[in-house]
């Protein structure tokens, strides 16, 4: 079966890393990129050099008005309106909507006017069905034309929650994500009418913030709807975040048994999605880790046989971008 042909709308952090991941994995072929704010020369530069993930190891060049990456010829568009992007001229069937702007179904549907067949939104969506690899991707059906890959935090939390809930049952839980800074934050204090704290300078503050990541687990695992919620602390690091899940279990257990359960999942049912470590790790140890969730066995604690705190790391850029590629590869095989 030939690799699905992919177009990327928005060549920001996720857009560029989805391209890297697609080429590295070889399961998807990126044939087109649309970004009205970046010209072709700058696009090549931004792909080649990355302050967090390092210089691109392959060949990046420009030929005949197209971006050339490791022998892949990629058509480049510069349209602000998704409805004007001629995806069909580049044979792009699967569109990664990575602008962060067109996250509602009616907005994302504009891609169909240019010939797209499926749209995967690389962000949470209020009305598009959300899928998390390793959790509920098997529920995807071919009639779904617009779907969401959820958020990077939900991609870390949901596999962790799935393993725990299936073994012990979850009565209720609170999640905190200590989250790396992102491009939407201010470098220095600036106006942010909807979120006053979010307008404070990202380089010198720990900033409490809201997140729908925990509630979103209820959308991919309906049996947990209403049982989880959470919040975030934005911290001045460029990449890698960590989930802190405090959870009340339905059945009694020990922390040693939880560790064994998580390790078994990482080695089997969640292989490729989840990893397990007992090492004395810190955040930079997971830069460019392609897992959705790395369970930190040495960081968790247990108050009693039904109440525990579980810790899991994730590269909120690279791990998530790999799941976007995996999700496209999966849905392309579902007929």
Curated annotation (Swiss-Prot):
Enzyme class: oxidoreductase
Pathway: Carbohydrate degradation; glycolysis; pyruvate from D-glyceraldehyde 3-phosphate: step 1/5
Record's protein name: Glyceraldehyde-3-phosphate dehydrogenase, cytosolic
Site (Activates thiol group during catalysis): 179
EC number: 1.2.1.12
Catalytic residues of the enzyme: 152 (nucleophile)
Binding site for D-glyceraldehyde 3-phosphate: 151-153, 182, 211-212, 234
Source organism of this protein record: Chondrus crispus (Carrageen Irish moss)
GO terms for biological process, alphabetical: glucose metabolic process; glycolytic process
């Amino acid at each position: 079966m030939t690799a699905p042909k992919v177009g990327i709308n928005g060549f920001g952090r996720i857009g560029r890393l989805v391209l890297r991941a697609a080429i590295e994995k070889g399961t998807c072929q990126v044939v087109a990129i649309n970004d009205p704010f970046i010209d072709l020369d700058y696009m090549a530069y931004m792909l080649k050099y990355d302050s967090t993930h390092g210089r691109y190891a392959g060949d990046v060049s420009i030929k005949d008005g197209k971006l050339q990456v490791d022998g892949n010829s990629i058509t480049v568009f510069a349209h602000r309106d998704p409805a004007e992007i001629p995806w069909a001229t580049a044979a792009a069937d699967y569109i990664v909507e990575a602008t962060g702007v067109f996250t509602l179904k009616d907005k994302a549907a504009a891609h169909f006017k240019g010939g797209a067949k499926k749209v995967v939104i690389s962000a949470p969506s209020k009305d598009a069905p959300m899928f998390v690899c390793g959790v509920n991707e098997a529920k995807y059906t071919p009639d779904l034309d617009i779907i969401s890959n959820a958020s990077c935090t939900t991609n870390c939390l949901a596999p962790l929650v799935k393993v725990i809930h299936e073994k012990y049952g979850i009565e209720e839980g609170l999640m905190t994500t200590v989250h790396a800074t992102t491009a939407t934050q201010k470098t220095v204090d600036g106006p942010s009418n909807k979120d006053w704290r979010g307008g404070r300078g990202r380089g010198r503050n720990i900033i409490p913030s809201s997140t729908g990541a925990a509630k979103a687990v209820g959308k991919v695992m309906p049996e947990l709807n209403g049982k989880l919620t959470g919040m975030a602390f934005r911290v001045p690091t460029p990449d890698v975040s960590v989930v802190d899940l405090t959870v009340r279990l339905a059945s009694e257990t020990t922390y040693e048994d939880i560790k064994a359960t998580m390790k078994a999942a990482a080695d089997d049912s969640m292989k490729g999605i989840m990893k397990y470590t007992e090492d004395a790790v810190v955040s930079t140890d997971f830069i460019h880790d392609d897992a959705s969730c790395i369970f930190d066995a040495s960081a968790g604690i247990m108050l009693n046989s039904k109440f525990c705190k579980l810790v899991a790391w994730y590269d909120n850029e690279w791990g998530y971008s790999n799941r976007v590629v995996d999700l496209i590869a999966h849905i392309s095989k579902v007929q």
